[in-house]
From Swiss-Prot:
Complex formation: Interacts with catenin beta-1/ctnnb1.
Region (Disordered): 659-689, 911-949
Name of the molecule in the record: Activity-dependent neuroprotective protein a
DNA-binding region, residue range(s): 732-774
Length: 969
């Protein structure tokens, strides 16, 4: 199905005419050569009548049209599909050409970038990669001459004589190998991709088990996503990898290929069924096992890694102890045993039992590097009944490790003792609870949320630091933690790790070479916090019982139900053991390991701060906030929780009688290592006072008695109102006090349930608008005195010329150059008072020494006296002024002599008698909304009157024959 792409179309089309001409010439020459052969043949008419002639079709000009060549890398030969990506081509092949999927699907070569079907790939590997992998050393030819090639140890031809080569597929993650490609692939599905298939694994119900479906599917499993029913667990894993996860290329990359040299006479006794007597050595000791070269080159990815061993005697084969996993499968599946043995030419080994064949326990290991995990093996037919029985009866084969110093292969159980005894290694324990071990070659860092290979894991852990298991000190160098362990904890053994720790064999160069075995304890998902607490309590109890001095233990009754549960759990940890498995978080899609019933609940509470519940209206499974107990909708996501926590009012509140929620590093799990809100320490008295006053100080404002904060307006009662009302209060506060201190901003934010940044930005924006208005609109600064009171002053006064304004007639009067919202009625005066005629107070004498002289036609108004005396105003009506004269708006007059002072003596003549009485008028306030005459009036009313303004009417006076006045309030 794979077709090579066509490139360089321009060059091809240029040469097409030439190629056609050449082909036509070649065809014409061919016809001329053979035309002479057919001249002698003269068929009869009967022969012509018996023949059938086909009509030639007419020439179609559309055939000469240039075709659309596919320049992409992966092209389908059965249809016009082409793609740059192998995954898209594979999906197309699976969906469109499903019937040819298994036989003609492309597979990636594990040695190079070649892709082809199964048969073509095997031919490609045999032709191009097989000679490069056959590395021999010390192999002697039939006549005793060493066999070699120009490059040293490469053999380009198969060995002659009594030896032959067998192709073997092996797993790059472990030591498993077999001659069949599918067997190795099923092994990878079963052993290395269980974590991928677990979220999709579902068990059939009791009805399906009792029905006829159970006969076809004896395993009783199905896919949760598409309800696919496989025949085996490996088929389910393959289904998940190929159809749901689309990571089949990873399985192909994990399968390696190599060749094994096998003697031809090895398989004859076993194929004929001749029993092998235990304890008797064969007569041909060098012909009854697989001889492997000393230099083995195994590909890892697209590179070749070769492990060079020490010197050995030429011509002597090397014997290798093969792991049980490579030859004898587990007791659950006996069918694979014959395949594993038959993969090396031992086809009749399926009937071997524990009394007829065994593996030799005295074989030496093949020296290999620690990075090479596929060890070549030597099968021997020797005795050791016990070893054979143990190898065949074990339900799970053990893992093997290669010593990095002596390059020998050992079981995992005996490797630690070998390294400590033979190489005088010092054991140093450390902790890295932020590392979660996935399998032997991959781990996950919970801090960085990334997967790390085994070769770079130690360097990454040193970046975060390794902790001492005794004193929990953190070190970023191996030498320092080794020195710390020798000095501070020389005789302390420490707690034994519950799981399999990460082992690093190191050689430190501190003066003399020193071998160190670093044992790093990682996070164990199978160990729950309750089980860890119970184990720690049991360990402490055992240590106390070992002490010679008796320990007096006081027993008390549990106060609450939780204490009783904790005590019962510590007393019977076995009964509280829960089923351990894997589950998937529906919010962040994190794979959770641990007790199935508690892992998801702990993760949702610690990471997302929610609890599972049932929606009261929708009747669907949803979540509720652990702070305010608000219920989310059923279509919520993780971002919805984040937005809610920003505005949640119950985050900083702690209900009475309950413990505060700690969202720190409660456990070393993956969910608890994410960033969360930090709860304040309840032991702090200031913070405890803040929690008690959380109704008015929700953002954490604490009062300081030595620094009291007095606000210009009282914000009490505005915290529960709408956002617009709270913003309006801030605007009114700005009009009273535009430059608040930092403590005032904090108190306002805490009282109004606003962020401090919002309050500060609100004041800053209004200040910036005021500065812009001063620059662009050029407003007038009002004087701070009452003009009506000023008109009664009896001494001379001098004003700047900029303080005067000119009064026009009614029909010529206009508005000042200020904003329209300021040109309203005066502040603090009712409409009836403004529109009515007000008499002018003239005092007791008819001729007073007044500083101003009123002009005819000007309206006189009463003036509020700001004095401590209780004197009252006597208002005398002016007969020369009409009662309905409208108040004119002032207009600014530009003075021609700027900077000069205008000093005029204005005389105010009054033609009314002093003995005339006038009604008493009380003092008026300028701004009733912000008046501070009484404590009750100091609070802001909350609204602005439509009649409020910043201008008040001023009296009109005559200066040098002109009608002038003063701006004032």
């Amino acid at each position: 199905m794979f077709q090579l792409p066509v490139n360089n179309l321009t060059r091809l089309r240029k040469a097409r005419k030439k190629v056609k001409r050449l082909l036509s010439d070649i065809g014409l020459d061919y016809c001329k050569e053979h035309v002479e052969d057919y001249k002698d043949v003269d068929p009869d008419d009967s022969d012509d009548s018996n023949e059938s002639h086909l009509d030639l079709c007419t020439w179609d000009p559309t055939w000469t049209k240039s075709q659309d060549y596919r320049t992409k890398q992966f092209c389908c030969s059965d249809c016009p599909f082409a793609s740059k990506y192998f995954s898209a081509y594979k999906n197309h092949f699976r969906n469109v050409h499903r019937e040819d999927f298994e036989s003609r699907i492309l597979l990636n070569c594990s040695y190079c970038t070649y892709s082809g079907n199964k048969r073509t790939l095997e031919t490609h590997v045999r032709l191009f990669h097989m000679p490069h992998n056959v590395m021999r050393q010390g192999v002697v030819g039939p006549h005793g001459a060493p066999v070699g090639a120009k490059d040293g140890m490469r053999v380009d031809k198969p060995m002659l004589g009594d030896r032959k080569e067998l192709p073997v597929y092996y797993c790059k993650k472990c030591t498993y190998r077999d001659r069949l490609y599918n067997v190795v692939r099923r092994h990878i599905y079963r052993e290395h991709f269980q974590h991928v298939a677990t979220p999709y694994l579902g068990k059939n119900s009791e009805k399906q088990v009792n029905s006829g479906e159970a006969q076809a599917n004896s395993h009783g499993i199905h896919c949760k996503s598409c309800h696919f029913t496989p025949r085996s667990y490996e088929a389910l894993v393959q289904h998940v990898i190929e159809f749901h996860e689309r990571i089949g290329h990873q399985v192909t990359a994990m399968i390696g290929h190599t060749n094994v040299i096998v003697p031809r006479l090895q398989t004859n006794p076993i194929q004929r069924g001749v029993p092998i007597t235990s304890g008797v050595r064969p007569q041909t000791p060098q012909m009854n096992r697989f001889s492997m070269p000393k230099v083995v080159g195994l590909p890892v990815g697209n590179h070749f890694k070769q492990s060079l061993a020490g010197n050995s005697v030429p011509g002597q084969p090397v014997r290798v102890t093969l792991p049980d996993k490579a030859f004898v499968s587990s007791a659950v599946s006996h069918s694979h045993s014959g395949k594993h043995l038959g993969g090396f030419g031992v086809h009749g080994a399926a009937h071997l039992n524990a009394q007829s064949a065994s593996f030799s326990p005295s074989l030496k290991s093949l020296p290999l590097s620690s990075s090479v995990h596929a060890a070549t093996a030597t099968l021997t037919s020797l005795q050791a009944k016990k070893a054979s029985a143990n190898a065949l009866n074990t339900s799970q084969t053990q893992k093997w490790k290669i010593c990095t110093i002596c390059n020998e292969l050992f079981p995992e159980s005996a490797y630690s003792a070998h390294f400590e005894k033979e190489h005088q290694a010092e054991k140093v324990r450390a902790m890295a609870k932020y590392i979660m071990k996935i399998h032997n070659f991959t781990s996950k860092c919970l801090y960085c949320n990334r997967y790390l290979p085994s070769d770079s894991l130690l360097n990454h852990m040193l970046v975060h630091g390794l902790s001492c298991p005794h004193c929990h000190s953190t070190f970023h160098e191996v030498e320092k933690i080794v020195a710390h362990n020798r000095l501070a904890h020389p005789n302390e053994q420490g707690d034994q790790p519950t799981g399999s720790p990460l082992t690093f064999d190191l050689t430190l160069q501190q003066g003399n070479l020193k071998n160190v075995q670093l044992l790093v304890t990682t996070y164990n998902m199978k160990e729950t916090p309750e089980a860890a607490a119970a184990a720690a309590a049991a360990n402490q109890l055992s240590q106390n019982s070992a002490m010679p001095k008796p320990v007096k233990v006081s027993v008390r009754q549990p106060d609450t139900q939780s204490d009783s549960l904790v005590r019962n759990m510590s007393q019977s940890p076995v009964s509280q053991k829960k089923e351990v498995g894997k589950t998937l978080c529906p919010l962040c899609f994190t794979i959770l390991k641990g007790p199935i019933s508690d892992a998801l609940a702990h993760h949702l509470r610690d990471s997302h701060q929610v609890l599972q519940t049932l929606h009261p209206v929708e009747k669907k499974l949803t979540y509720k906030c652990i702070h305010c107990l608000g219920v989310y909708t059923s279509n919520m996501t993780a971002s919805t929780i984040t937005l809610h926590l920003v505005h949640c009012r119950g985050v900083c509140q702690t209900p009475k009688g309950s413990k505060p929620i700690t969202t720190g590093l409660r456990s070393p799990g993956a969910g608890s290592l994410k960033r969360e809100l930090v709860t304040p320490d309840p032991s702090d008295p200031k913070r405890r006072k803040m929690v008690d006053q959380s109704r008015f100080y929700p953002t954490g404002f604490a009062e300081k008695p030595e620094e009291p904060i007095v606000l210009a307006l009282d914000p009490k009662g505005y915290g529960d109102k709408s956002y617009e009302v709270r913003k309006a209060f801030l605007t009114a506060y700005f009009n009273r006090h535009p430059y608040p201190s930092q403590r005032e901003v904090e108190k306002l934010a805490a009282s109004l349930w606003l962020w401090k940044s919002d309050v500060a930005s609100h004041f800053g924006n209004h200040r910036r608008l005021c500065d812009r208005d001063f620059t662009s609109r050029k407003p007038v600064v009002l004087l701070g005195f009452n003009m009506r009171l000023l008109s009664q002053i009896k001494h001379d006064m001098s004003f700047d010329d900029s303080c005067l304004f000119e009064v026009f007639d009614d029909e010529k009067s206009g508005y000042s150059r200020t904003s329209s919202f300021r040109l309203k009625s005066p502040i603090g005066f009712p409409a009836d008072f403004i529109g009515s005629k007000q008499p002018l107070n003239t005092g007791q004498s008819s001729q007073s020494n007044c500083a101003f002289k009123t002009c005819p036609g000007s309206s006189s108004e009463p003036i509020a006296i700001d004095s401590d005396s209780d004197s009252e105003l006597e208002v005398i009506p002016n007969e020369n002024v009409s009662q309905h004269t409208p108040a004119l708006r002032p207009s600014i007059v530009q003075s021609q002599t700027k900077g000069a002072l205008l000093r005029e003596s204005l005389r105010c003549e009054r033609d009314v008698r002093a003995n005339r009485s006038s009604p008493r008028v009380g003092p008026k306030v300028l701004d009733g909304s912000v008046s501070s005459s009484s404590p009750d009036e100091a609070t802001w009313s909350g609204n602005m009157s439509s009649e409020e303004s910043h201008y008040i009417p001023a009296g009109r006076f005559e200066v040098k024959g002109k009608k002038v006045g003063l701006l004032g309030r």
